[in-house]
């Protein structure tokens, strides 16, 4: 459950290290975002010579949450951190590598590129 002002780790090599959610996209009064949802973020920490800079406003897709994902069979998949992957204007990942596991819930949507780059899909 990601909401406005939530900090997330970045799970790709775009150059950002930490981002803050400034808007949950999809509806005028939408409060929370889960795995697979697109959010508007601002870069709070970045590495030198990265593709994105501190202060930039970008879109991102949530790939891991501490809250977890409830599956149809009743199982719950939780993670130790909240993480996102930075997206460009065409909703394609900015980075060329994904770090850490991602969930199968991304597969049903338009994020097959993230699924193919991820080292582990749960």
UniProtKB/Swiss-Prot annotation:
Name the source's superkingdom.
Bacteria
Instruction: Read off the PROSITE patterns from this record.
Output: RIBOSOMAL_L14
Q: Name one GO cellular component term.
A: cytosolic large ribosomal subunit
Alphabetical list of CDD domains matching this protein = Ribosomal_uL14
UniProt KW RNA-binding keyword: yes
Q: What are the alphabetically sorted keywords of the record?
A: Ribonucleoprotein, Ribosomal protein, RNA-binding, rRNA-binding
Give one GO molecular function term.
structural constituent of ribosome
Give all cystine bridges in this chain. none
InterPro entries noted in UniProt:
Ribosomal_uL14, Ribosomal_uL14_bac-type, Ribosomal_uL14_CS, Ribosomal_uL14_sf
What is one Gene Ontology biological process annotated in the Swiss-Prot or TrEMBL record? Answer: translation
- What is its biological role? Binds to 23S rRNA. Forms part of two intersubunit bridges in the 70S ribosome.
* Oligomeric form and interacting partners: Part of the 50S ribosomal subunit. Forms a cluster with proteins L3 and L19. In the 70S ribosome, L14 and L19 interact and together make contacts with the 16S rRNA in bridges B5 and B8.
Indicate the family of this protein: Belongs to the universal ribosomal protein uL14 family.
Q: What is this protein called in UniProt?
A: Large ribosomal subunit protein uL14
Q: What is the species listed in this Swiss-Prot or TrEMBL entry?
A: Saccharophagus degradans (strain 2-40 / ATCC 43961 / DSM 17024)
Lineage of source species: Bacteria, Pseudomonadati, Pseudomonadota, Gammaproteobacteria, Cellvibrionales
